[in-house]
Amino acid sequence: FSTNIDLTPFYDSLEDNTIKGHALSSVFGAKTPNSEWEFLTGNSMAFLPSGSVVYQQYITDTPTSLVSNLKNIGYTCVAMHPYYDTGWSRNIVYPNMGFDETHFIDDFDQTKILRDYITDQELYEKIVDRYESKKSNEDLFIMSISMQNHGGYTEKYDNFDEKARMLGINYPDVNQYLSLIHESDSALEYLISYFEKVDDPVEIVFFGDHQPSLSSSFYPYLNGKGLGGLTLSELENLYTVPFFIWTNYDSDKESVELTSLNYLSTLALERAGIALPAYNQFLADMMEEIPAVNSRGFYSKSQGKFLHVEDAAGEDAKWLKNYEILQYNNMFDKRNK
């Protein structure tokens, strides 16, 4: 569909020193922590019961993750989320994950609000503040989960001037969401522009947690069917989010047609020139054969289509079974870790 303005001109312009593309999330419309978990651990919701929320069910001690791997080589690990600390038990989970610092809503300027939520701009300024206060020899990993564009999108707000709209048809909630994305693009330009100028090597990994839940009448307009009766490939379109990995130093420009959130930390480590731990090396190898996997299924490179995990055959089945075994060992098999 067409809009009255370019929604993400800065994001669209990012090419140099950037890997950019689309990734499968395992959730739609809600349950952000499952996306966080897939990114941080390299594990997949494909092997957990439907409806699971990992943060509330499965994290009772420190799992092997990007956090533990970076701490092992001397990084300070910081989590930032400009909302209440008890949401999805993050006040318990983040320390259990090994984060050295956590910053929640009380650590942000609560006058910097768009609709009901702290802005991306305020979050990014907090990231900059933490970077500028670091010790001279301190290596930092900062994970931040934004709130600005959180659903729903049906109320009108005095503090938000909606600039974007669809042309030729009117879905008010979609227009609000598109306007929020436009605001996010401006904040992203601030963040990248700042770190372009610093002397330290910096890598920024940016991805959507899930697609928004919008008016049910919008989806037939979008895909001709709505939310029911979809093929697996059509369903996976609803679970696809944008991502990029940008560096402020010279790195290859790359376009990725499709990956999944469980692979992003491996891509980030490779891009940063950090030696891959054994689990991430397995994921890097698996990625060559199965480029994307999530709670709904996987993309089979050999067959050129999406399949349900239970329908995997041949080498696909071997990769997925080994992945499931390694994930079980990573999550539950404390005796044999």
Annotated model-derived regions:
Residues F1-K337:
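Solvent-exposed soluble domains appended to multi-pass membrane proteins
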